[in-house]
């Protein structure tokens, strides 16, 4: 079977995939970390698209996702998903993080996109433990692509080598890489 899940270390804004997933905050207006980097690289068109979404629905709730155009990014679209803030693991964080991945994947598939790149959602300023977040990400994506034809290719884009190795280990254990 052809490998459908890949680990890449680098800058998610440079990837030529159909969809880049943005680890957004509820306002969708950009912020720090990967959210800010995606907004800066995409230019004003992305902010305008996010403003339109906000006018239609208000804030994006935790675990939900919305899709917009990609502005100046090499991608065709951006899925903005809001992951949970880590509060010790007793506030349904695992389910909310799983929902963030699932709702992103559903939007990718519903719009017939074939490739998607995910950052490590919630592991920056939202302080989700990296190993636990990676386990949820790998399990959720693996289960989804087993049951769905799209997306054909999924990339976990890691900012540093340590996180990339974490994802690679998990995928090797599952036999997906």
Curated annotation (Swiss-Prot):
SMART domains: A1pp. Deacetylates O-acetyl-ADP ribose to yield ADP-ribose and free acetate. Down-regulates ribonuclease 3 (RNase III) activity. Acts by interacting directly with the region of the ribonuclease that is required for dimerization/activation. Substrate binds at residues 11-12, 25, 33-35, 122-126. It comes from Shigella flexneri serotype 5b (strain 8401). The gene is ymdB. It holds the Pfam family Macro. The keyword Hydrolase applies. Belongs to the MacroD-type family. YmdB subfamily. It catalyses: 3''-O-acetyl-ADP-D-ribose + H2O = ADP-D-ribose + acetate + H(+); 2''-O-acetyl-ADP-D-ribose + H2O = ADP-D-ribose + acetate + H(+). Homodimer. Interacts with RNase III. InterPro entries: Macro_dom, Macro_dom-like, O-Ac-ADP-ribose_deAcase. Keywords: Hydrolase. The active site is at residue 35. PANTHER family: GANGLIOSIDE INDUCED DIFFERENTIATION ASSOCIATED PROTEIN 2-RELATED, MACRO DOMAIN-CONTAINING PROTEIN. This is O-acetyl-ADP-ribose deacetylase. It comes from the Bacteria. One of its GO terms (biological process) is purine nucleoside metabolic process.
């Amino acid at each position: 079977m052809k490998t459908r899940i890949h680990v890449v270390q680098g800058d998610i804004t440079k990837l030529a995939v159909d969809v880049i997933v943005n680890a957004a905050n509820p306002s969708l207006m950009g912020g720090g970390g990967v959210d800010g980097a995606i907004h800066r690289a995409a230019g004003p068109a992305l902010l305008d698209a996010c403003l339109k979404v906000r006018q239609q629905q208000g804030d994006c709730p935790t675990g939900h996702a919305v899709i917009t155009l990609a502005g100046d990014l090499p991608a065709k679209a951006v899925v903005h998903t809001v992951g949970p803030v880590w509060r010790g693991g007793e506030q349904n964080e695992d389910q909310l993080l799983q929902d963030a991945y699932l709702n992103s994947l559903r939007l990718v598939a519903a719009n017939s996109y074939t490739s998607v790149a995910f950052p490590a959602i919630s592991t920056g300023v939202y302080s989700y433990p990296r190993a636990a977040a990676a386990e949820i990400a790998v399990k959720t994506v693996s289960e989804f692509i087993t049951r769905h034809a799209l997306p054909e290719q999924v990339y976990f884009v890691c900012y540093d080598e340590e996180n990339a190795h974490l994802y690679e280990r998990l995928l090797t254990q599952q036999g997906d890489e």
